[in-house]
Amino acid sequence: EITYEYNDEKEKDKVISQSIKVGDIINKGDTLKVVISLGKLDKEKLASDNINELGTVPIMMYHGIVDMKSSETEYTGGNVDKDGYNRTAEAFREDLEFYYQNGYRMVRLTDYIDGNIDVEYGKSPIVLTFDDGNENNLKVKGLDEDGNIIIDENSAVGILESFKEKYPDYNVTATFFVNGGLFNQPEYNEKILKWLVENGYDVGNHTENHLDIKKSTSEQVNKEIVSVYKQLDEIIPEKYVNIIALPFGSPYNKEHENFGYVLKSTYNGATYETKAALRVGWDAEYSPFDKDFDPTFLKRCRAYDNNGKDFDIEMVFKLLETKRYISDGNVSTIVTSEKNSSKISDNVNKEVITY
């Protein structure tokens, strides 16, 4: 078990202390705990580098990734439909390159929600999500001689995996929200789900039939949510995430009578609790350390092109330039300016450093 902390006496990356020393008798079950130095705390550098772990975090919302060049579509930029919900493979590759070159590093949605943001110094977290379980999210071309799935290199996961190879320091991950058809490849669905959770990706709930929760009965809401959780329980028990991406972003406020069934769903004797719910748009979300952070109703940023208007991908990242979360590289501390300190949640159990 390794933790890091600032230390005025030990140089960066040197061992400050360890629980088991030379000559110690090691018993079964003993854990080696090591504390590594981050070097001397330099508040002037933190300030000059704009380190701010109270900044906002973009949760990107994707749907289909279509094997096309952007020049082949009649719509704006990399959009494949007029509303920009589906994106060309070329545009998705460009998105990933843009994130990397502009200092964004992917983190798991669950880690963001839990405040476990492990991002290198000076970089910013970004979360990727995909709705609907489209076949082109992870398209299977067949099986190899060992029975493993062969992933289409132009599907979303194929493209993501290529970035793992291109940038070894790029923590490639995403959360896929599925309906009752899972990834719409019946002969491969089970293998797809298992492959995803074994390779750094997560799978969540998008209701059985893409239900408009605002327009539905309480029984429908419970049935649709429980149905997907039960499917995931049967195939990847304890390995999926209890998170729902709300179809259509509905209901549009937490006061709606059906919202309680989103967070706790019961049908035919089965009950599931949901830790977080995702909306459809539009802007970056609060830091998980901000007192206004609410994981049960998280905003997302639509990954579409609209010439820098209406919170398209260009506009979102332009706005983030002055308010983005910038990491100090230490998951055990929260660093921000003194003027931001009043925004820190009372529930935070990490060391707070201000400059």
Identify the residue ranges that each predicted region occupies.
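Envelope-exposed proteins and targeting segments
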Residues: 11, 16, 28-32, 56-58, ...
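C-terminal active-site subregion of NodB/CE4 polysaccharide deacetylases
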Residues: 46-128, 139, 215-355
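Solvent-exposed coil/turn segments that connect beta secondary-structure elements
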Residues: 5-7, 37-39, 65, 131-133, ...
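Acidic (Asp/Glu)-rich catalytic clusters
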Residues: 160-171, 185-205, 269-271, 287-297, ...
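Alpha-helical scaffold elements lining the catalytic groove of polysaccharide deacetylases
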Residues: 141, 148-159, 183-202, 208-236, ...
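Alpha-helix termini
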Residues: 148-151, 161-171, 235-237, 262-272
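Short loop/turn segments at strand-loop or loop-helix junctions that form parts
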Residues: 60-65, 129-133, 179, 206-208
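Ligand-recognition elements built from short beta-strands and adjacent flexible loops
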Residues: 1-42
